[in-house]
């Protein structure tokens, strides 16, 4: 919570004393999914927002997860079992605060998002703890091309706007991304980016794609890289264990993503793409649709 308080203080210092008022409610929703060797994780997320003025917005939401597990063995302290099947449930309720400035020189937004542990920890939908993520994004438009960059600090590795991760984590991390978007036509664009996640200290990983045993012994945590699961990469502990504590180097990640998007109107968008994690030696395809009405 000290991290969250510090973030709120910094945001308070950078807010302008006055801003042109443009208040109003908004409602948005999205449905997206990511598929890889561990299974398919999909998420639908309704969000209610309120614009205080042109620069400051708050929002609340609640995600719902749908997970199709692949038929791979899991290794924990209990005997291995098949992880094939389907699971669903709510994730962590969240509240966000966003400050943004748009001008000819630079577009900037700073977002603080807090989550409450309302999701099922045993299914990997929650860490069982309150989390905070402070992200800062910069972009500038050059005709049809818009480069962008982002940097943030959090105590969890969050899903991105287009990528639903196969795990939830608890531990201090920094996250970074840089890339660009090119407008092919008025409503069609292609994008690419490189990303990195740098962890600090031990990280607890909760898998969304490995079933937890119902027996008492199965709830014990494992040790990374000691199983005989589907993955040959010892870093992919989320494919072999439902919950485990790992050192920072296991949670570190870097890779590239590419996607295209279609926005027939300002209220509707669709995207699909591919992400390659170099650290995890992991390929993922993803998709998403979304809508937005109001301010």
Summary of predicted features, one role per range:
Residues 31-37, 62-68, 101, 114-120, ...:
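Transmembrane beta-strands of outer-membrane beta-barrel pores
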Residues 18-52, 57-59, 65:
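Short glycine/proline- and aromatic-enriched beta-strand/turn motifs that initiate or cap beta-hairpins
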Residues 71-83, 175, 179-295:
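Outer membrane beta-barrel transmembrane domains
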Residues 32-34, 78-84, 119-124, 161-167, ...:
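Extracellular loop and loop/strand-boundary signature of outer-membrane beta-barrel proteins
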Residues 46-50, 60, 95-99, 112, ...:
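Residues on the lipid-exposed face of transmembrane beta-strands in outer-membrane beta-barrel proteins
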Residues 38-45, 70-77, 110, 120-128, ...:
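Outer-membrane beta-barrel translocator domains and adjoining extracellular loop/strand segments
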Residues 55-60, 104-108, 144-149, 186-190, ...:
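Repeated loop/turn-to-beta-strand initiation elements of outer-membrane beta-barrel proteins
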Residues 40-44, 88-93, 126-132, 166-176, ...:
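Residues that define the transmembrane beta-barrel architecture of outer-membrane proteins
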